[in-house]
Amino acid sequence: DFTVDYFVGRFLGIDDEGLKRSLIEEFYPICKRLSSQKMVCTHRDFHSRNIMMKGDEFMIIDFQDARLGIPQYDLASLLEDCYYDLNEENRELLKRMYFEKLPKEVHGQKDYEQFQELYRDMLLQRVFKAVGSFAYIYHHRKDHRYLKYIGFAMEKLKLAMLDQPDLESLKTKLFNLYYDS
């Protein structure tokens, strides 16, 4: 509801409540799949701007949003960070390494394909939420710097939904809203 309110309603200026509700309903199966997975402690705001250097050591900051989430949450948050573009080769290498190093008891997936499917769902949810956050910041602070991140995030979503027949309806609604508004 947050992203639909700030991105669709306030940023795009669309007041059609039925359309907003249908967009939320498109995300319901994704959220249901994610919420049925094994949960672990997650940072929930794990991106490049929250990783700092102190001397020769990395420090992670901004823990106030820590909650339970699936193991892919922080991974998708970092690798699909809207503040920088990690190339696909490195993204895939890091996903594969994460899957192989994390004990199966923690991630709970039977194979890498299942891990990837949940990663994709997490990417969609996390990046869509980021779109809402950028729209919120723009709306309340009038900070134009965040407008470029909305576009960057929408392109990430478009790539993630490419060749995904199960997401055709969501893709059509979301991108008709964004690119035709």
Can you annotate each of these PLM segments?
Residues 54, 58, 66-68, 84:
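Activation segment
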Residues 38, 43, 67-68, 116-124:
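Secondary-structure capping and boundary motifs in well-ordered enzyme cores
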Residues 1-43, 52-55, 59, 148:
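ATP-dependent phospho-/nucleotidyl transfer catalytic cores
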Residues 132-181:
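ATP/Mg2+ or Mg2+-diphosphate-binding catalytic cores
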Residues 108-117:
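Histidine/acidic-rich helix-loop-helix segments that form or flank divalent-metal centers
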Residues 2-11, 71-108, 121-141, 153-160:
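Active-site activation/catalytic loop segments of kinase-like enzymes and analogous catalytic loops
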Residues 46:
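Hydrophobic HxD+1 residue recognition
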Residues 62:
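Conserved active-site aspartate in kinases
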